[in-house]
Amino acid sequence: MSENHDAVVYNTNAENGGGCPVAHRRAPHPTQGGGNRGWWPNRLNLKILAKNPAVANPLGGEFTYAEAFRTLDLAAVKQDIAAVLTTSQAWWPADYGHYGPFIIRMAWHSAGTYRISDGRGGAGAGQLRFAPLNSWPDNANLDKARRLLWPVKKKYGQKISWADLMILAGNVALESMGFETFGFAGGRVDVWEPDEDVYWGPETTWLDDERYTGDRELENPLAAVQMGLIYVNPEGPNGNPDPIAAARDIRETFRRMAMNDEETVALIAGGHTFGKTHGAANPDEHVGPEPEGAPIEEQGFGWTSTFGTGRGGDTITSGLEGAWTNTPVSWDNSFFEILFSYEWELTKSPAGANQWKPKDGAGAGTVPDAHDAAKSHAPTMLTTDLALRFDPIYEPISRRFLENPSAFADAFARAWFKLTHRDLGPVARYLGPEVPTETLLWQDPLPAVAHELIDAADVATLKGQILASGLSVSQLVSTAWASASTFRGGDKRGGANGARIRLEPQRGWEVNEPDQLAAVLRTLTRIQEVFNAAQTGGKQVSLADLIVLAGGVAVEQAAANAGFDVEVPFAPGRTDASQEQTDVESFAVLEPTADGFRNYLGKGHRLPAEYLLLDRANQLTLSAPELTVLVGGLRVLGANYQQSPLGVFTATPGSLTNDFFVNLLELGTTWKTTSEDANTFEGRDAATGKVRWTGSRADLVFGSNSELRALAEVYASDDAREKFVHDFVAAWVKVMNLDRFDLV
């Protein structure tokens, strides 16, 4: 198969190369990021399955952030943050004497990378501290915002993570300027390295937009319109100052970040109620490199400006210049009042950026200067602000907020909370005294456990009933896997808890084989109903627990078929969500369009199947050995989509053997592609030409990729049969419990 997916761009040093970038290029030293990827840019990057290793964590394995956070005096932290906000520093003076708007921007940009398609991005790990986010053009000068908070972080140390502190500081900033927030939850755990598993786009130049095709169709899973922007271009699409065209970009981008039209209007208007933009001069002429490209003496700072003092009134950030309102450090309804009070005309900032001012000199002198009390200005609007007035969908929402300030305040409070907490996961992960009591649909709510849990004797009884039900190992394993493997490590959504596999939209997903799924669920539901009806003391079993238990029963049976007596650990405590607690549109983005664990490959993928398998393993937070053992086990258990024979390298399906690895690595097999797209292959006996096996790319990669082959060789060894069973059980239980935050 020709590797028609996008190649990884590899930067080489062509200095002293006689002007020829090919014959004389010089590969980087390993400390500069050199290595095998330079020679083979399309090789699988298994390092994304070894994120944040324990040896990189300076806090050690005994440290538990949740326990440390619970000892924190949150009110005292907020007081200290509030003091920072109103103590202007000479090295980076506060606009209007208040850092609140600056800190809000930092919190917003920390959270604003989240996208619904894959659940990656967001504030949950404090990635704004690291490349590439710390050096995106849209994050210019936010390095200073984080430094302003260092005294607070230093004081409280490991009791509050940077990830939590940045979001908490955003809340305090809002509150200090008169706004009542919806609440705050801690629980974001810092990591110690950049995310290397997030696809930010195909571009290799800042602010390029190769992510579009056709009629401005944005590539999935991306949300931002250009490389290095959080959302949209404030000047309009590619700098075109067209509010209607900008509205289209806004709507698509915010939708991909889980926001509806009302939330979008509230967020833009609420954020632009505060502060100003900064464009004192042309950044191309005066601004130095971003933090990751700055010299060592800058000590992590970037964007050093040579214009004037480089700060205060001489600050250059976006290139846009001006404030939206005449009360830029107070919460009020002035954004909408000003937006609708004036007619607007296009103008240029001192840096040459497109922005808007009131026509005919209206509004002059109504907006205070950020640093000089003797100066005043007219208000400024951006092209994206005018979209809220002129787009036919946004306009009535904006007018309603203009006429109902309390509705606007409530909408902004809720949207801000959603923005800053969307990737934190379910409420079970929320920490602190300011967690809201109201349940919100986007939190994927679950009912509380309101019954006595089953005990070991009950588990034994239910296991017997499951074994006697007539359901096969394949059916039980497939159903449990389908239920649990929706989990996404990025935003902690999905998983088996809630038994949402029986609800829309999951019960209708193609990969879940709806007809077979319905039959299995009917049988398990009957077992559940009979068991629950027989209880007299309030004991119950949820269908969510029963699905997982049934999968474990099947694994135990398959192990027994292979000659091994194992017990699959099981922890009851899951509950069953209702359809009313399940937002169909929100859950639709969790649908797998490829699942190499089930040898399922939908249509329209840019990447080959083995890359999609790796991505799914990453979402499931699996290591490379766990990925390997799960694929090998699921193949021999018959968990393939539509019972496909692909990768079922065994004569005894339903037995938990290491046959997948033994037969894949058999030296007498020759593999040839059987499809034009090179997704399926036949393995023939090299001597007779007889077809032995058929396999997919998600199978053959374990013999092709050198790292995966090394792992496959472990499990194919004669002394690994028992190890394989135990390792499979451990990895299986991990997946079944990924969303059991109560067990952590």
From Swiss-Prot:
Q: Which CDD domains match?
A: catalase_peroxidase_1, catalase_peroxidase_2
Xref: Pfam families? peroxidase (PF00141)
Q: Which reactions fall under this protein's catalytic activity?
A: H2O2 + AH2 = A + 2 H2O; 2 H2O2 = O2 + 2 H2O
Q: Which domain of life is it from?
A: Bacteria
Per the database entry, which stretches of residues form a coiled coil? none
Question: Which residues participate directly in catalysis?
Answer: H109 (proton acceptor)
> Annotated cross-link Tryptophyl-tyrosyl-methioninium (Tyr-Met) (with W-108) - which positions?
Y231-M257
Q: Where is this site: Transition state stabilizer?
A: R105
Stated EC number for the protein is 1.11.1.21
Question: What PTMs does it carry?
Answer: Formation of the three residue Trp-Tyr-Met cross-link is important for the catalase, but not the peroxidase activity of the enzyme.
Q: Which UniProt keywords apply?
A: Heme, Hydrogen peroxide, Iron, Metal-binding, Oxidoreductase, Peroxidase
Specify where the region named Disordered lies, as residue ranges.
Answer: 353-372
Q: Which cofactor does it need?
A: heme b
| Gene Ontology biological process terms in this record | cellular response to hydrogen peroxide; hydrogen peroxide catabolic process
Q: Which GO terms describe its molecular function?
A: catalase activity; heme binding; metal ion binding
- Copy out the cofactor comment: Binds 1 heme b (iron(II)-protoporphyrin IX) group per dimer.
- GO annotations of cellular component type: cytosol
Q: Where does heme b bind?
A: H272
Cross-link Tryptophyl-tyrosyl-methioninium (Trp-Tyr) (with M-257): located at?
W108-Y231
- By its UniProt entry, which InterPro entries does this protein fall under? Catalase_peroxidase, Haem_peroxidase, Haem_peroxidase_sf, Peroxidases_AS, Peroxidases_heam-ligand_BS
Subunit-level organization: Homodimer or homotetramer.
For this chain, the family text in UniProt reads: Belongs to the peroxidase family. Peroxidase/catalase subfamily.
Its biological purpose: Bifunctional enzyme with both catalase and broad-spectrum peroxidase activity.
Q: Which HAMAP family does this one have?
A: Catal_peroxid
Q: Specify the protein name.
A: Catalase-peroxidase
| Organism (species) | Frankia casuarinae (strain DSM 45818 / CECT 9043 / HFP020203 / CcI3)
